[in-house]
From Swiss-Prot:
It comes from Emericella nidulans (strain FGSC A4 / ATCC 38163 / CBS 112.46 / NRRL 194 / M139) (Aspergillus nidulans). Its EC number is 3.2.1.67. Belongs to the glycosyl hydrolase 28 family. Coiled coil: none annotated. It catalyses: [(1->4)-alpha-D-galacturonosyl](n) + H2O = alpha-D-galacturonate + [(1->4)-alpha-D-galacturonosyl](n-1). This is Probable exopolygalacturonase B.
Length: 440
C-alpha cells in the first residue's frame, strides 16, 4: 500500500472558503507593521526580547468573541512577516481560526504566540474542509511547512476539543467503519528546522502534534493538556507527539497531561532525542506503532530518551508493532531509555507485538514481522500500578521477528506493596541481562 498525503479537496463543499483566504496586498483593519529599527515600538508591544534578535514585526486585530474569525487576518500577517519577520499575537488577546489554512510556504519567519489561538468547534465545517492524511485517517485544521520556522511565547494553542470529545464518545479511531474524523491541533509537513518553544497546547480534538515528511523538528518547554468537562466523554487519541517520515525530532523540558501516548513516533522516524519529559495519565513513551499497512516497510531507529517521569498511566517505556493477517514489516533499532521514573503504571516496560488489541489466536496465526534490535532500558525505577500483579516488565517477541541485543540494566521496579517486580520475556535472543520468566 502506498501512502499519499494530499489535501482532502474532494470533500470541500465549495471553493469559496479558500478564495476568501488568498493573501491581499491591502493591509487589513487593525493590522500594524513595525520596523526592525523601531526598538521603542517593539518594546511597547512586547516584541523585544533579550533572547531573540529584533525583527520586522506584524500585529493583527484580535477576535471580539469566539465566532469572530480572523483566519484571513492571520494569513495576511504571516505572509507579511515571512522572509525575516515576526508575527506577534499579543498577550491577553484571543485570535479565532475558523477556516483551514495552508501555511506550507514559510521561510525564515517567527510567530510569537503570547495570546490565545483558538479553533472554532464547527464540526460540519472542519470535517469537510481540512488537510487529509491516509495514515490512520488523519485530518488537520492547518499545515505548517517551509524552512526556518520558530513558534515561541507564553500563549496557548487551543483546539477547543470538548464538542469533539462529546460526539466521539464510544467510538474508536482505528475502527475501519469510523467516519468521524477529528482534527489534529498542529501539523508540520515538509518542514525543515521548525521549532516550538514555551507555549501551551490545549484540548486537541485528536493528536496534538503530527510531524510529516520533515527534518530537524524541535519542541522545548511546551505544556500539553487535554481534559473534558463531561465525565462520560473523555479526550481520546490526544497523543502528545506523533511523526511520520521524520529525520531529527527533539522534545525537551516538556510536560504532557493527556489520555493517550505521551510521545509516539510513527513509521520512518529516525534520530530522536527526548530529555526531561513529564507524562501524566498517558500510554507512555512509545516507539511506534509500526508495521500497520500491508507490504509497507516501517522503521524507527536511533532514539535516545533520557530523564522521563511517567505517572498514572497504562505504559512506561513501550515498543509496539502490529500483528494480523494484513500488516507490514520493519524494524525498531538502536533505542535507549535511560533514567525513567514510573509511578502507578500498569506496564513500566513493555514490548507489544500484538498491536492493536489483536486477539491471542490471531496474533499467533499472523505474528508481527517487525524486528526489534539494540534496545537498552537503563535505570528504570519506581512502582507499577499492580494491574498486572507482580509483573513490571513484559518483553514478548514475535516468532516471525528477530529480537536481539535487548538489555535491562539497573532496573528497580516494585509492586505497590513494595515487592520486587517480575520480568517476563519470550523469544529474546541472548537474554535481557536480568532474571526473566516465561509468559507460559
Amino acid at each position: 500500500m502506498r501512502l499519499h498525503f494530499l489535501p482532502l479537496v474532494a470533500l470541500c463543499a465549495t471553493t469559496a472558503s479558500s478564495l476568501a483566504f488568498d493573501s491581499s496586498t491591502s493591509q487589513p483593519p487593525g493590522a500594524q507593521v513595525y520596523s526592525v529599527n523601531d526598538a521603542a515600538g517593539l518594546k511597547r508591544i512586547g516584541a523585544h526580547h533579550p533572547k531573540y534578535h529584533d525583527r520586522r514585526t506584524v500585529t493583527i486585530r484580535s477576535s471580539h468573541n469566539d465566532t469572530d474569525d480572523v483566519s484571513a487576518d492571520f494569513l495576511w500577517g504571516i505572509r507579511r512577516a515571512n522572509h525575516g519577520g515576526r508575527l506577534l499575537l499579543k498577550k491577553g488577546q484571543k485570535y479565532v481560526i475558523g477556516r483551514k489554512l495552508d501555511l506550507s510556504f514559510l521561510d525564515n519567519v517567527e510567530v510569537q504566540l503570547d495570546g490565545e489561538l483558538k479553533f472554532t468547534d464547527d464540526v460540519p465545517y472542519w470535517q469537510e474542509n481540512n488537510f487529509y492524511y491516509d495514515f490512520q485517517k488523519s485530518i488537520s485544521f492547518w499545515r505548517w511547512g517551509g524552512h526556518d520556522v520558530r513558534i515561541f511565547g507564553r500563549g496557548t494553542l487551543n483546539g477547543n476539543g470538548q464538542r469533539w470529545y462529546n460526539e466521539f464518545a464510544g467510538q474508536e479511531i482505528l475502527d475501519p467503519d469510523n467516519t468521524y474524523y477529528r482534527p489534529i491541533l498542529f501539523v508540520a509537513e515538509n518542514a525543515t528546522r521548525l521549532s516550538v518553544e514555551g507555549i501551551t497546547e490545549l484540548n486537541s480534538p485528536c493528536w496534538t502534534n503530527f510531524l510529516v515528511n520533515s527534518k530537524d523538528i524541535s519542541f522545548d518547554n511546551v505544556f500539553i493538556n487535554a481534559y473534558s468537562t463531561n465525565a462520560s466523554a473523555e479526550p481520546k487519541n490526544t497523543d502528545g507527539f506523533d511523526s511520520l517520515n521524520v529525520n531529527g525530532l527533539s522534545v525537551t523540558n516538556t510536560r504532557v497531561d493527556i489520555g493517550d501516548d505521551c510521545f509516539s513516533p510513527k513509521p520512518n522516524t529516525t534520530n530522536i532525542f527526548v530529555q526531561n519529559l513529564w507524562c501524566n495519565n498517558t500510554h507512555g513513551v512509545s516507539m511506534g506503532s509500526i508495521g500497520q499497512y500491508p507490504g509497507v516497510l516501517d522503521i524507527i531507529e536511533h532514539a535516545y530518551i533520557e530523564n522521563v517521569t511517567l505517572l498514572n498511566g497504562e505504559n512506561g517505556a513501550r515498543l509496539k508493532a502490529w500483528a494480523g493477517e494484513d500488516v507490514g514489516y520493519g524494524r525498531i533499532n538502536n533505542i535507549t531509555y535511560k533514567n525513567i521514573h514510573v509511578e502507578n503504571t500498569d506496564y513500566p516496560i513493555v514490548l507489544d507485538q500484538c498491536y492493536f488489541n489483536i486477539p491471542a489466536d490471531e496474533c499467533a496465526s499472523y505474528p508481527s514481522q517487525v524486528n526489534v534490535t539494540n534496545i537498552v532500558f537503563e535505570n528504570v525505577y519506581g512502582t507499577s500500578s499492580g494491574a498486572e500483579g507482580n509483573v513490571v516488565a513484559e518483553l514478548i517477541c514475535s516468532p516471525n521477528a528477530i529480537c536481539e541485543d535487548i538489555k535491562l540494566k539497573g532496573i528497580n521496579l516494585t509492586t505497590p506493596e513494595g515487592e520486587k517486580g517480575v520480568v517476563v520475556c519470550d523469544g529474546i535472543s541472548g537474554g535481557v541481562g536480568v532474571e526473566c520468566q516465561s509468559s507460559e
